[in-house]
Swiss-Prot record:
The keyword Oxidoreductase does not apply. The gene is mug172. Belongs to the ADIP family. GO terms for cellular component: cytoplasm; mitotic spindle; mitotic spindle pole body; MWP complex; nucleus. Keywords: Coiled coil, Cytoplasm, Meiosis. InterPro entries: Afadin/alpha-actinin-bd (IPR021622). It comes from Schizosaccharomyces pombe (strain 972 / ATCC 24843) (Fission yeast). One of its GO terms (biological process) is meiotic cell cycle. It is found in: Cytoplasm. This is Meiotically up-regulated gene 172 protein. Residues 72-166 form a coiled coil. The keyword Electron transport does not apply. GO terms for molecular function: spindle pole body anchor activity. Signal peptide: none annotated.
Amino acid sequence: MTTPIVFCNPSNIEESLLYINKSLFSKGVIQAEKLRLSHDIRDNCNIVNIIYRLLRATDEERLEKESLLDAIKNNEYEKQRDNNTIKRLKNELELYQNECQLQLNKVRTLERDQAELITQNKGLKDVNAKNELTLKALKNQLSVSLRQHEQQMETLKGNYGLVKARKGRNLNSMLIVKEPIKQNTNAPILPETASFLQQNDENSNFLNSRVNNDEFQLLKGLNNELKKSNGTLLTCLSGTLNSLVEMLSPLYERPNSNPFEVCELNAILLDAKIQNQLLFIRNLLHERKYVSIDELDAILEENEKNKHLINILQKENKRVFEFLTNMHDKF
């Protein structure tokens, strides 16, 4: 506990009381009364009353400060809440702006699509109008042809009536039938009909050329695939034969080698050759490629050579085995 500061002592008691009275009077705590130190009970009560006033003023000031502090805290809380509300409103505004931008982009896309549809619709209307004109021209030609056909039928009926009437008078008369009116091959063709016929000819020529081109490209691709597969097969056979020759060359260059080494080498060569043949057949069956007759003859010839070499290896192994058997019997 700290020692309180002492302002008054017996040497300055009078000056201290005078200073206190002036200070209390200036602050409005006392009016006419003064602090006096005496044995009078009234002076002591006056001192106690002044102390009570000071305590109450201190309590009121403390309460006022506490209320001000609470008000400040409430203001800070309101300010923080307002800031949070502002942030939330900003986020909602950004989301709304983004949504508006998306809707605007959709509207622009729909407008472009609508413009394209309008253009396509206009083109379809033009095509439909041309088709209607062409159909109208064809109907006109059909009606003309029908009228000509009706005229021909009427002419034939008239000729038949004349012949039938004359038949009773002259049995030797010949049936005279007027030649039907031939359609004029040089008759003018309407512009709509001419353009329609020309368009049909162009479409048919285009389709025929397209079909022929597709068939040619298909055959060309098939031919390239056959060439590629045949080249792969010939390369495989050539590599197999070369590897077999390379493997057999040391065997015939050293005829006086150790029989055990010769037997081991022959076994390795024979196994490698058989594995190569199996791999070749497996690849051939897996790819399911087709070869020409000439290339098939070459493949068969290579297979015969491979069979001959395999027989040579088998005979060599048999000879080495017999040699080893004789050596074992001797020892």
